[in-house]
Swiss-Prot record:
Residues carrying Phosphoserine: 29
Gene3D superfamilies: 1.25.40.180
Region (Disordered): 1-25, 738-780
Highest taxon in the source lineage: Eukaryota
Lineage of producing organism: Eukaryota, Fungi, Dikarya, Ascomycota, Taphrinomycotina
Record protein name field: Nuclear cap-binding protein subunit 1
Main subcellular localisation: cytoplasm
SUPFAM superfamilies associated with the record: ARM repeat
Subunit structure: Component of the nuclear cap-binding complex (CBC), a heterodimer composed of cbc1 and cbc2 that interacts with capped RNAs.
Length: 780
């Protein structure tokens, strides 16, 4: 008889059962509420979900009003709205309209929201969180339809009064000025107060004092030209644009005003007025320092047909501000950031931009009343401005690469023509570009091609193969192809190029150039013994015995070169192997390398000989060898100076110089942070001065020697200007952090990444070349 008892079988008790009185519980009500409403608020007015923004706002507002039962629940809702405003600021007008719409059923929401954002505004100012304060003020401005007249004026006046008393620029002063100027157009567009334009004029007059004082401190270089230093600084330009807008009666028709969809309903709202707290601002010494100035980056002003707002139009600054805020504050999700950017036109008024994907050659045929601005050009210009427009990027360059890649994946037919125009423009301008701009652009271009099967219309550039080998256009092609080889395999890159351009590929690498592995080499036996001694960790005395052999003594090869080449061979299987060799044989390697400066130069020279056909590997290894103090920074500069002058036109040289000087800067910063030890500061300063002067004097001498060779002089001058502008005077607040100590570095770097013997390397050598590793293998 079966023992089965059907549904009457008792449930088995577990450790978490009745015996212990434990039951998994659901989260508290506020956590559940946040989870329910977060998605609705985040995707508010998103064109992917609802093509009609008014319907979406109405739907979400009804949902929120049902949830808003008490002050605690309303606070949770406002926290979600503020978070969304921070990461997707382009939706601020829609979020403000959502609050007003929800308050029709729950008036307490509006009262709480006005008080909440007003309090957050002053709190963030006191905490020096200027971006957050800018967003909070804009939220209040876009809610002004439901605020009492004059409520917002003190929020502007307090900042304007503070900066009007300043006689020199400061970090806090520039940020106050930005908050005021960039929010004034929104204030005028959203406010129904009859005196709003007079108030805007008063604020601009107050700001004029500070703007005039800061002009004398502005020093800028043009990232798109080595000849033209005339550049418009962002805040100075924004002020000029608003002054010009005054002549047009402050008209900003492109700013979205979604609250107008509900004007007939909003007449029933009782306006509120949040209390303005007594506020005093006390800046720290860091906030009183001289600010960093940023040039307004323009690319599309060089085309015959203008597809972006003119620099004199405040729309240029408004679109750039919104785009850059999305780029810099949605960085944790580049796919979503790319989606918001490609939908940029949706968040401004209808017909602000030409239809997506409209060919440039068709723009002149449009009706004169129709816009010729292309949203895709605006976002590409904004991303490239962040990548190319300043010496120090906010994030690693690979983030901006990946963002452009995602934009192109989302809307390839729309963005591909824009990318093509930019690439051709930069190629044409290559002889005028500063070194850093050229290097970063080539880095992006090669990375971008690697994600789209390396397809490019190379045939357009075939005639330029006949140019001099050092001509910037030919260098542009050659170094792009070199970077592609790092991201793929030789045969694949070769197949993607027309026959005429394959001469730029160079010789196909078959692996490291370890000359002693050939059995016919006179030192084959000794090199094998050295490798075995290193592998078995034999004492230094036994190595010395091997080096005393007659074959080595009679050879032209020095002991330093032989030992280092054998060590390189041991570490050539992967990057992990290289780090292990440096760590385990550190004392042995230092014994040979640090005998003299000449020995260190030999170590560097042997490394580049070992990676003869893959010099980026050598740059990557040198970065780690500097961490382990196997060589000094001076030895790298000395080695560079002794090479053929054509080396200054190679991108691996640019990366090597950048890596070397970043190490100097990091050491200086680390020594400055250790205030108790003044000797460290003096030593770091002395090292920086010696190395910088060594390179600068050598470059000037080489320029003088090669004055008759136009393109050799061109590359030497580019490097000279690059070093002078980036490293001649290192500011404490712009120096990059030093690498971790050797012990920590080695533990972090134990990754089993294979170093391809042909041409594919998973990890690239410098900050500007992190595309393969940090992009999480975009191609795959």
């Amino acid at each position: 008889m079966s023992s089965y008892r059907g549904s009457t079988r008792p449930r088995k008790r577990t450790r978490e059962g009745e015996n212990y009185g434990f039951r998994p519980h659901r989260g508290n009500s506020q956590e559940l509420l946040a989870a329910r409403i977060k998605k609705d608020i985040t995707f508010l007015a998103d064109p992917r979900g609802n093509s009609v923004a008014a319907d979406d706002i109405n739907y979400v507002a009804m949902s929120l009003s049902r949830e808003a039962n008490d002050p605690e629940t309303i606070s949770t809702i406002l926290d979600c709205i503020q978070t969304t405003a921070f990461i997707i600021p382009v939706k601020i007008p829609h979020l403000a309209t959502l609050i007003i719409r929800a308050s029709l059923r729950v008036p307490l929401i509006l009262e709480k929201a006005a008080a909440y954002f007003c309090l957050q505004y002053f709190t963030n100012l006191n905490s020096f969180l200027y971006y957050e304060a800018k967003v909070d003020l804009r939220m209040l401005i876009c809610m002004s339809f439901a605020l009492q007249p004059g409520t917002l004026k003190p929020l502007f006046s307090l900042l304007a009064d503070a900066i009007s008393k300043e006689t020199k620029p400061s970090v806090w002063g520039d940020n106050f000025l930005r908050i005021i100027l960039i929010n004034l157009p929104y204030f005028i567009a959203a406010n129904n107060d009859l005196g709003k334009k007079d108030f805007a004029n008063e604020i601009l007059d107050q700001c004029e004092i500070y703007v005039r004082h800061r002009k004398s401190s502005i020093t800028l270089s043009n990232p798109l030209s080595i000849h033209d230093n005339l550049s418009e600084e962002e805040l100075d330009l924004l002020y000029k644009q608003l002054i010009l807008s005054r002549e047009n009666d402050f008209t900003f028709p492109y700013i979205s005003q979604p609250w107008k969809f509900f004007e007939s309903d909003f007449v029933h709202i009782v306006p509120v007025s949040p209390s303005i707290p007594e506020w005093t601002f006390q800046p720290t010494p860091q906030q009183n320092e001289l600010p960093s100035f940023k040039r307004f980056f323009e690319l599309f002003n060089n085309f015959e047909i203008r597809t972006t707002p003119d620099a004199s139009d405040v729309a240029a600054s408004i679109f750039r501000d919104i785009s850059v805020d999305v780029i810099n504050h949605l960085e944790f999700n580049r796919v979503e950031a790319a989606q918001v950017l490609t939908d940029l036109d949706v968040y401004f008024t209808y017909k602000t931009f030409a239809l997506r994907g409209t060919p440039v050659n068709e723009l002149p045929n449009l009706d004169p009343s129709e816009s010729r601005w292309k949203a895709e050009d605006i976002i590409v210009e904004a991303v490239l401005g962040e990548l190319l427009g300043s010496q120090n990027t906010t994030y690693k360059p690979v983030y901006y690469h990946s963002l452009l890649i995602e934009c192109c994946r989302i809307a390839p037919k729309i963005l591909a023509p824009t990318f093509g125009r930019v690439i051709r423009l930069m190629y044409t301008m290559s002889s005028d570009l500063p070194l850093q701009t050229l290097d970063r652009f080539i880095d992006w271009f090669s990375h971008h091609l690697s994600n789209f099967n390396f397809h490019w219309k190379w045939n357009e550039w075939i005639p330029d193969v006949e140019l001099d080998d050092l001509h910037p256009k030919k260098v542009f092609m050659r170094e792009t192809i070199t970077r592609e080889l790092i991201l793929s395999y030789y045969t694949r890159i070769s197949d993607s190029l027309p026959e005429e351009l394959r001469c730029l590929l160079g010789e196909q690498p078959s692996g490291p150039n370890f000359v002693y592995e050939n059995e016919t080499h006179p030192l084959y036996q000794q090199s094998s013994q050295i490798i075995e001694a290193l592998r078995l960790h034999k004492p230094l005395e036994e190595l010395d015995i091997i080096l005393q052999s007659e074959e080595i003594q009679n050879s032209e090869t020095s002991a330093v070169r032989l030992v280092m080449s054998c060590a390189y061979s041991l570490g050539s299987r992967s990057f992990s192997h290289a780090l292990n060799v440096f760590e385990k044989h550190l004392n042995t390697l230092k014994h040979f390398s640090r005998k003299s400066l000449d020995s260190e130069i030999e170590v560097v020279d042997e490394l580049f000989s070992f990676w003869k056909l893959q010099p980026f590997n050598a740059v990557m290894w040198l970065d780690k060898m500097l961490n382990y103090s196997i060589i000094s920074i001076t030895s790298i500069i000395e080695w560079l100076i002794k090479q053929d002058v054509t080396i200054w036109s190679r991108s691996y040289t640019w990366s090597l110089v950048n890596t070397t000087f970043n190490k100097l800067a990091a050491r200086l910063r680390r020594s400055v942070s250790n205030k108790e030890d003044s000797s460290l500061i003096n030593e770091a300063n002395e090292e920086k001065e010696i190395v910088t002067n060594l390179l600068l004097s050598a470059l000037r001498a080489l320029i003088s020697e090669n004055a008759e060779n136009i393109w050799v002089s061109h590359w030497l001058n580019l490097m000279l200007k690059y070093v002078e502008s980036n490293f001649l005077s290192v500011k404490k607040d712009t120096i990059e952090e030093a690498n971790e100590p050797v012990q920590e570095n080695t533990s972090e770097e134990q990754e089993d990444t294979k170093m391809q013997p042909v041409d594919a390397v998973d990890e690239q050598p410098s900050e500007n070349n992190q595309t393969a590793a940090d992009a999480t293998n975009e191609e795959k």
